[in-house]
């Protein structure tokens, strides 16, 4: 008879379960519930418990909007039930043997508004099983509960992540992990989070490597004043003149009001965001892109080829725009060079809306990511990749869309059922590309070098040799011509 696995942590004992050869602990609280007086306050260590706490089931996900029927691209991205008491993590380990396995910590994205570490497709069991490492996913506050300014502490979402890392460093040895071999892996907002953590005085001591998938480094944090204006907009949408009234609103109403804020502040041709990270001396004193350039952690950074199609493909205001409308939009960025900008971002037969998608993808992801690789290469090693596998959705019109690489890195396409953007992928392509990327991530977490039998060469990016690993249908090859000088020259005119 197999007994229930028990892990001993600084907060108390946890009772997990054994699943498919792994020891699993879900819904583990790493901080005090951020409710009551702790709403909009920095995360605090959990006070602990007596006895054995059940850790066999997920805790609630962070409150967030849920799109009826799901996103036309991602499907469902949240994982109900939702509740403010959401500061938990989930952990998979091959053994509780006191080993010194490397640790992978997954930080999900979702436009700073949606997502969950509880999603089945974000479970890190595939990494734990295939790489003999400890895999962890975390939850943190989102949207109005994580990003408001003027209500207490700033950037409480980031303090959640810091507290999670502190808990992991203090306790992962009890799960067979090595606190001195922690790698953070994040996508989109999760990758941006990693860069912010790299400059945090506590967090930067608690991890050693990072994989940044599609970090939107072109996103500028707001000032406290700009962010407080969004807080006031939320209060207004809920019928209040004073932001203090928000303290008494249930989280369901805060989420409801957030939809109004999002609609009010999303302009034509802009990536929709209701709230932003905030410049704050204690948490984000400078743009995260600067910290990741200067950081001594080992990193991989990458992007998908067509990041910018994600928010616009199913937005009729943009997807049905004609060339005149797009050039009018370009004039606000490039002035008299709008026509040249259009041609630079338009391929043969490109629809007008994809010009906007290319510009936004370039500004938010490609150029900023390339800058990180280029500037960091003069100081520290860095590897870069571009993911080119095209989503079958809408006959391939979205290209290699934002998020498309994740089923391959996680090696769990079967858990993405119902996600429209991956339906219809060629099984041979899936097998081939998964063998490359999933094992590369494992190798990097284990050794700092992502090469392996199926990927014998992945050179570091250097200013005099800008090598980027391009991952496509046939596998991976190294390219050195991805700077897209036509786009850069137009942007700097």
Swiss-Prot record:
The lineage of its organism: Bacteria, Bacillati, Actinomycetota, Actinomycetes, Micrococcales. The active site is at 188 (acyl-ester intermediate), 307 (charge relay system), 402 (charge relay system). The gene is pcd. SUPFAM superfamilies: alpha/beta-Hydrolases. The keyword Hydrolase applies. GO terms for molecular function: carboxylic ester hydrolase activity. Keywords: Herbicide resistance, Hydrolase, Plasmid, Serine esterase. Monomer. InterPro entries: AB_hydrolase_fold, CarbesteraseB, Carboxylesterase_B_AS, Carboxylesterase_B_CS, Type-B_Carboxylest/Lipase. This is Phenmedipham hydrolase. Belongs to the type-B carboxylesterase/lipase family. GO terms for biological process: response to herbicide. CDD domains: Esterase_lipase (cd00312). It comes from Pseudarthrobacter oxydans. Its EC number is 3.1.1.-. It comes from the Bacteria. May degrade the phenylcarbamate herbicides phenmedipham and desmedipham cometabolically by hydrolyzing their central carbamate linkages. Conveys resistance to the herbicide phenmedipham.
């Amino acid at each position: 008879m197999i007994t229930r696995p028990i892990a001993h942590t600084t907060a108390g004992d946890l009772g997990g379960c054994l699943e498919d050869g792994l020891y699993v602990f879900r819904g583990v609280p790493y901080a005090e519930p951020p409710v009551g007086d702790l709403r909009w306050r920095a995360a605090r260590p959990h006070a602990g418990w007596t006895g054995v706490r059940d850790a066999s089931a997920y805790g609630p996900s962070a409150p967030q909007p849920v799109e009826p029927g799901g996103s036309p691209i991602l499907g469902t991205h949240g994982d109900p039930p939702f509740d403010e008491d959401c500061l938990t993590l989930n952990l998979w380990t091959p053994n509780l043997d006191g080993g010194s396995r490397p640790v992978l910590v997954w930080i999900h994205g979702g436009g700073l508004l949606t997502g969950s570490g509880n999603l089945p497709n974000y479970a890190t069991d595939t990494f734990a099983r295939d790489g003999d490492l400890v895999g962890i996913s975390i939850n943190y506050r989102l949207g109005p509960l994580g990003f408001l300014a003027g209500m207490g502490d700033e950037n409480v979402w980031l303090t959640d992540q810091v507290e999670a890392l502190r808990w992991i460093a203090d306790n992962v040895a009890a799960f067979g992990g090595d606190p001195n071999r922690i790698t953070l892996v994040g996508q989109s907002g999760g990758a941006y989070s990693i860069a912010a953590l790299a400059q945090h005085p506590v967090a930067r001591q608690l991890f050693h490597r990072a994989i940044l998938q599609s970090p939107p480094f072109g996103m500028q944090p707001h000032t406290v004043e700009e962010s407080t204006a969004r807080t006031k907009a939320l209060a207004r949408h809920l019928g209040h003149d004073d932001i203090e009234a928000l303290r008494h609103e249930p989280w369901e109403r805060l989420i409801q009001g957030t939809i109004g804020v999002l609609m009010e502040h999303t302009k034509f041709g802009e990536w929709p965001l209701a709230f932003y990270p905030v410049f704050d001396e204690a948490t984000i004193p400078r743009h995260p892109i600067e910290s990741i350039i200067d950081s001594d952690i080992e990193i991989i950074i990458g992007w998908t080829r067509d990041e910018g199609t994600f928010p616009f493909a199913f937005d009729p205001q943009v997807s049905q725009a004609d060339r005149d409308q797009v050039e009018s939009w370009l004039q606000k960025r490039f002035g008299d060079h709008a026509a040249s900008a259009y041609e630079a971002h338009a391929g043969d037969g490109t629809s007008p809306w994809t010009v906007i998608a290319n510009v936004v993808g370039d500004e938010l992801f490609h150029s900023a990511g390339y800058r990180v690789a280029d500037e960091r290469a003069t100081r520290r090693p860095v590897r870069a990749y571009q993911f080119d596998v095209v989503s079958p959705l809408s006959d391939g019109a979205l290209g290699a869309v934002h998020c498309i690489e994740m089923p391959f890195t996680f090696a769990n396409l079967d858990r993405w059922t119902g996600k429209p953007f991956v339906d219809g992928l060629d099984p041979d392509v899936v097998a081939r590309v998964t063998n490359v990327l999933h094992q590369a991530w494992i190798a990097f977490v284990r050794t700092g070098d992502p090469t392996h039998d199926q990927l014998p060469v992945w050179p570091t990016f250097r200013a005099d040799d800008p090598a980027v690993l391009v991952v496509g249908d046939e596998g991976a090859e190294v390219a050195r011509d991805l700077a897209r000088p036509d786009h850069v020259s137009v942007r700097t005119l």
